[in-house]
Amino acid sequence: MNQKEQIKVFLDLYDVSRETMEKLSIYEKLIIEGQKKCSLIGKSTLGNIWLRHFADSAKLLKIVKDVHLNSGGKALNLLDVGSGAGFPGVVLSIMADAEKIPINIVLVDSNRKKSLFLESIKKELGVSYTVVNKRSENINQKFDIITARAVTSLKSFLNLNYNLIRKESILVLFKGRKWKEEVNESKKKVEF
């Protein structure tokens, strides 16, 4: 599927403003440019950014909206662990800003080049989030929502990041084919 077709599918899935689409288009170009300097995303997904990365990330906006409403409208704190190229954190920042959802997004990545990339995206797009260049287990704060894509096994993630989670926290962890096995293995540590 070419870029125009991907954008059409994205627009069919998500009703977003022209301004949001402009920011996402600029973001796509910056990812492609940044990929030359630093491995931001898998090479095989470079031609599929709109569906593989943007649409995947945009799915979380519904969760963010629901948590925001259920919290009585308070500003949320979201942590994106191992943010890399900024999925889902940057996409959520763009979309939440457009919908005026009060959210403090923290993107954490231990890779300095990726953290610098995320800072440059923030300036270029004029979006609001915080970039932290360290390992997530070294962060001393609790979050309402915690996201991670392609970081580590569920058990390892929970062991390393238990200090970030409170009882009410919502974890959105993108997992692969073996997700059921990972959940069963992790049930010994956490109640689902």
Give a label for each model feature.
Residues 2-73, 79, 112-127:
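Class I SAM-dependent transferase core
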Residues 31, 92, 174-175:
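Residue-level signal for inorganic ion chemistry
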Residues 58, 90, 155:
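Conserved active-site region of classical short-chain dehydrogenase/reductase
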Residues 75-76, 170:
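The start of beta-strands in P-loop NTPase/AAA+ ATPase cores
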Residues 80-84:
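Conserved S-adenosyl-L-methionine
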Residues 85-100:
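Conserved SAM-binding loop of SAM-dependent methyltransferases across substrates and taxa
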Residues 96-106, 110-192:
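S-adenosylmethionine
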